[in-house]
């Protein structure tokens, strides 16, 4: 029997008939009535005997609760009433069947970095995946099996030690699967494509608790949907994806700090470098941030920009000389093994980008080239808002440019990911300690930035990478403007999740 790790919640206010019926009359949850207000103790007594011994069930009074329920984005966060921390993949199917029998909503969580405001509609049971961190390299050395709780830094470190790499997200602290189900951008994508492009097989628990192996030979319709809209269809307990022998053993990085007077020249040179989707594959990642740095100025944001090159400084220099010539305020550089690149480029597992507990109002946009006028408008608005609301000084405007060579080689119709002609990923993140009086200010700020970006490319429709989207954007902006895309997704939703169990992450219906 699983450990019953707290006795919180004896006295939830439920009808007397239900109190009499549970848990004694429902030892395994087989009740016909709605019991969505089950306490952690009741869930432990009923579900505990059905799942593996190493799994655990706990509520808010348990010492593990804070870690299990902490969110990167505290604004509009899901509400959890009980956590089930699974130790085996097979537990997930049992949990979902139990939850369904008791009309208890469930939500799978790995690292807690989801951004959509639709998550605020959730209240119920958390399926905590963070113990499922197994990685098995297949004997042919061409793929590996990853459990659903793996995360980027762990994957980079583990594969590197064995002489391999694969596409991961750029932030070391973020789970692999969350980004993968929406596409999955990162430093290796110019070489190998998105995370989702490299997935060979998914082991999925569907809405009714049944399991399915999803690949290009099994449930092929669902395989298409899971690669770009996967949050809408199931819980992935493990997945197999392609891995690649390490070819580059040392990466060169260079980080610059620019002042605002260099803004227009900077974006002119960035447009030359990224060449409307032709950024050299070895110039794997360049991205920047508008942010406050009080050691430089108390009133004007700095423009911080980093370049990650898969090779030596001498090879990279031809691309960096134009930026050196802008006379940056400062710069730092060096060569490191690939797993250390996140740390030196500001996205490591212990960097501030991974901090949890703040309100974060977000608003993305997808671009092909930078519009310098829009970039100036966004910069000036940043300074005005921080001056008017000093509590928002931790905010950032993030602008990402990865090589897209391998991404563009994949047929756009081959998966639900619709944005292979977005070459630059924009994101405003307004960050502050929980304070509801600032919410509308923050929403107005990100909305205005989205307007600037989108008006700066008048021949294109607005797009929003689904993993960066807040949910205020249109479904077409997230899932594609071709009518057949949403039509196909909705038909598959009706087939695989007719009751809408998976409807909390930018839902398609």
Curated annotation (Swiss-Prot):
Enzyme Commission number(s) of this protein: 1.-.-.-
Signal peptide range in chain numbering: 1-21
Start and end residues of each FAD-binding PCMH-type domain: 75-246
Keywords annotated in UniProt: FAD, Flavoprotein, Oxidoreductase, Signal
Cofactor(s) annotated in UniProt: FAD
A Pfam family per the record: BBE
Alphabetical list of InterPro entries matching this protein: BBE, FAD-bd_PCMH, FAD-bd_PCMH-like_sf, FAD-bd_PCMH_sub1, FAD-bd_PCMH_sub2, FAD-linked_Oxidoreductase, Oxid_FAD_bind_N
Cytoplasm listed as a keyword: no
Broadest EC class assigned to this enzyme: oxidoreductase
PROSITE patterns for this protein: FAD_PCMH (PS51387)
Reactions mediated catalytically: (2S,9S)-annullatin H + 2 A = (2S,9S)-annullatin D + 2 AH2
UniProt keyword Oxidoreductase present: yes
Phenotype on disruption: Abolished the production of (2S,9S)-annullatin D, but not that of (2R)-annullatin F, (2R)-annullatin G, and (2S,9S)-annullatin H.
UniProt GO MF annotations: FAD binding; oxidoreductase activity
Domain of life: Eukaryota
Role description: Cytochrome P450 monooxygenase; part of the gene cluster that mediates the biosynthesis of annullatin D, an alkylated aromatic polyketide with a fused dihydrobenzofuran lactone ring system that exhibits potent agonistic activities toward the cannabinoid receptors. Within the pathway, anuG is responsible for the five-member lactone ring formation in (2S, 9S)-annullatin D via oxidative lactonization between the two hydroxyl groups.
Family, per entry: Belongs to the oxygen-dependent FAD-linked oxidoreductase family.
Record's protein name: FAD-linked oxidoreductase anuG
Gene source species: Penicillium roqueforti (strain FM164)
Species lineage: Eukaryota, Fungi, Dikarya, Ascomycota, Pezizomycotina
């Amino acid at each position: 029997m699983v450990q019953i790790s707290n006795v919180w919640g004896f006295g939830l206010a439920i009808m007397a008939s239900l109190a009499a019926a549970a848990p004694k009359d429902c030892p395994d949850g087989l009740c016909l009535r709605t019991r969505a207000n089950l306490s952690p103790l009741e869930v432990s007594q009923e579900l505990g005997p059905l799942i593996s011994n190493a799994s655990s069930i706990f509520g808010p009074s348990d010492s593990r609760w804070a870690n299990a329920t902490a969110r990167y984005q505290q604004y509009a966060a899901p509400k959890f009433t009980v956590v089930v921390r699974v130790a085996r993949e097979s537990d997930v199917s049992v949990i979902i069947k139990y939850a369904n029998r008791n009309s208890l909503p469930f939500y799978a969580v790995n690292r807690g970095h989801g951004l959509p405001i639709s998550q605020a509609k959730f209240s119920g049971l958390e399926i905590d995946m963070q113990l499922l961190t197994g990685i098995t390299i297949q004997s042919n050395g061409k793929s590996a099996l990853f459990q659903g709780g793996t995360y980027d830094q762990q994957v980079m470190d583990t594969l590197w030690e064995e002489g391999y790499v694969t596409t991961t997200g750029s932030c070391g602290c973020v789970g692999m699967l969350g980004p993968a189900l929406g596409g999955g951008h990162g430093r290796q994508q110019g070489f190998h494509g998105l995370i989702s492009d490299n997935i060979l097989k998914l082991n999925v628990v569907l809405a009714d608790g049944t399991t399915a192996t999803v690949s290009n030979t099994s449930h092929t319709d669902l395989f298409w949907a899971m690669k770009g809209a996967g949050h809408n269809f199931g819980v992935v307990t493990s997945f197999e994806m392609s891995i690649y022998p390490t070819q580059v053993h040392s990466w060169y990085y260079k980080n610059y700090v620019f002042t605002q007077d260099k803004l227009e020249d900077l974006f002119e040179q960035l447009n030359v470098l990224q060449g409307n989707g032709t950024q050299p594959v070895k110039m794997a990642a360049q991205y920047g941030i508008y942010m406050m740095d009080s050691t430089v100025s108390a009133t004007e944001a700095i423009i911080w920009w980093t370049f990650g090159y898969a090779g030596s400084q001498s090879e990279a220099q031809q691309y960096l000389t134009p930026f050196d010539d802008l006379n940056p305020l400062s710069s730092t550089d060096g060569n490191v093994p690939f797993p250390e690149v996140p740390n030196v480029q500001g996205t490591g597992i212990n960097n501030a980008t991974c901090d949890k507990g703040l309100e974060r109002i977000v608003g993305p946009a997808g671009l092909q080239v930078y519009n310098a006028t829009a970039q100036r408008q966004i910069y000036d608005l940043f300074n005005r808002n921080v001056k008017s609301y000093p509590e928002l000084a931790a905010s950032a405007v993030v602008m990402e440019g990865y090589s897209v060579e391998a991404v563009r080689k994949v047929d756009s119709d081959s998966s639900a990911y619709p944005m292979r002609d977005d070459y630059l990923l924009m994101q405003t993140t307004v960050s502050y300690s929980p304070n509801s009086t600032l919410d509308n200010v923050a929403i107005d700020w990100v909305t205005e930035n989205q307007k600037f970006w989108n008006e700066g490319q008048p021949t294109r429709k607005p797009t929003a990478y689904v993993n960066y989207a807040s949910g205020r954007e249109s479904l077409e902006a997230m899932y594609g403007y071709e009518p057949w895309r949403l039509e196909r997704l909705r038909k598959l939703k009706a087939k695989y999740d007719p009751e809408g169990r998976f409807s909390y992450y930018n839902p398609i219906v």
